[in-house]
């Protein structure tokens, strides 16, 4: 359970990195500077920092590819986990559970797993009280 939560947190972090907006170009930065009339030294340093962010485009591409690989593996793990839970919970054969999971969308599978683990965590918490 702990590993699943950590993996989910990593997936969310990679999603944020992969979906972040590309850095602004120098031309756009100059327009922003003119519009805001930046005279303060801190603002100028901030704009220089933004201009240097174009180097991070390569890193963003790397994380984007890594994110896709991790997401694919996470989806496969979620499918297997959903099938196991259905077999255990509903008492049906693995083939039937696999057919049910295949008919579900990825969003439905995630919701199913979150509901299952949420109920399980709530039961454990209530037992401790």
Curated annotation (Swiss-Prot):
Domain of life: Eukaryota
Record keywords: Antibiotic, Antimicrobial, Cytolysis, Hemolysis, Secreted, Signal, Toxin
Principal localisation: secreted
Tissue and organ distribution: Expressed by the venom gland.
One Gene Ontology molecular-function label: toxin activity
One Pfam family of this chain: Latarcin
Signal peptide: 1-20
UniProt organism field: Lachesana tarabaevi (Spider)
Protein function: Insecticidal, cytolytic and antimicrobial peptide. Forms voltage-dependent, ion-permeable channels in membranes. At high concentration causes cell membrane lysis.
Localisation per UniProt entry: Secreted
Protein family per UniProt: Belongs to the cationic peptide 06 (cytoinsectotoxin) family.
Name assigned to this protein: M-zodatoxin-Lt8i
Organism lineage: Eukaryota, Metazoa, Ecdysozoa, Arthropoda, Chelicerata
Example GO BP: killing of cells of another organism
CC annotations in GO: extracellular region
Propeptide residue intervals: 21-60
């Amino acid at each position: 359970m702990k590993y699943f939560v950590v993996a989910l947190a990593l997936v969310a972090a990679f999603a944020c990195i992969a979906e972040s907006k590309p850095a602004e170009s120098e031309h756009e930065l100059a327009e922003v500077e003119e519009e805001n009339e930046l005279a303060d030294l801190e603002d100028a340093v901030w704009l220089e920092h933004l201009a240097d962010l174009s180097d991070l485009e390569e890193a963003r591409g790397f994380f984007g590819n890594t994110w896709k690989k991790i997401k694919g593996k996470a989806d496969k793990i979620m499918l297997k986990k959903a099938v196991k839970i259905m077999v255990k919970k509903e008492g049906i054969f693995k083939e039937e559970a696999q057919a049910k999971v295949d008919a579900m969308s990825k969003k439905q599978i995630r919701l199913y797993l979150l509901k299952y683990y949420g109920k399980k965590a709530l039961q454990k918490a209530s037992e401790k009280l």
